[in-house]
Amino acid sequence: TVSAKSLIMVQERTRHNGSAQERDAMDAPSLTLGIEEEYLLVDRETRDLVRNPPDALMDQLHKAIAEQVTSEFLRCQVEVGTKVCAEIGEARAELIRLRRLVVEVADGFGYAPIAASTHPFSHWDEQEHTKKERYDALARDLAGAARRMVISGMHVHVGIEEDDLRIDLMNQVRYFLPHLLALSTSSPFWQGEDMGLQSYRLTIWDALPRTGLPDTFDGYSEYNRLVQQLVGTGIIPDATMLWWDIRPSGRFSTLESRITDICTSLEDGIAIAATYQALLSMLYRLRQQNQRWRLYPATLMGENRWR
């Protein structure tokens, strides 16, 4: 096994490609924050998942939160997203507001949202997927593997506007992702059983293609070539179908962490988001000092991810 304690302090000093003038000319990243949370909807009396909530629920949520709430692949799930936040306190206030509004709207239908990455006893084969063209295509392509995705997560976007810098920091921060996962776990139960894992969500998620830790890339051009290959061969329609633990966002100039469970405690989720933002800030400062975090073998990081 791999000792995180023995590895985490290891750094190697190495020179970046390009001159110091080129590095200095690169704009510093904004490191803005955006947080997305997925909630499962349960019946307040039975505590079971809501199999087929009325369309009026989403209508009311849209009235309350507008574009900050979206439906998900399964009808028993909704997703909220904060606005772009300049600092962590602003993101915290946004999540408090969003959680409160979802609770209030759901309560009017006899439902409640739960911030847990799996439901403790509901069965996946009883759930229905949302009827949208994108979701219908997923259901056809992924079949039963998609229907088992009765799981929720927390995604954290950090603003890194320069393309090559975004890839460079992604390569390095991969090492820390298992640590963030360990801090977030909220999914030990599945269909009425204690699975013996603190994050069974990740085991379910890994059944899909294009998941797990991403490869390293020499720069944005290499990453973009991969995306274009996948799109050109009809495997994916766009980069949003890359479901890695971390990825350059397909919609924003952000680096999106996707590995964590959703935290039942809002304060825990905010602490993890702040830690992720701080790690990227640290790695950028190291770069400015002509240093970088060591790139560890994928096998070792994968073992830490499992542990």
What is each model feature region?
Residues F109-S117, L181-S184, P188, Y284-Q291:
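Long, hydrophobic, amphipathic alpha-helical segments used as structural scaffolds
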Residues S30, A116, P120, E133, ...:
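Metal-dependent DNA replication initiation modules
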Residues H62-K63, E104, T118, E126-T130, ...:
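Short amphipathic alpha-helical patches
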Residues K5-Q11, H16, E22:
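Short, positively charged and aromatic/hydrophobic N-terminal segments
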Residues H16, H62, H119, H123, ...:
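Histidine (H) residue identity feature
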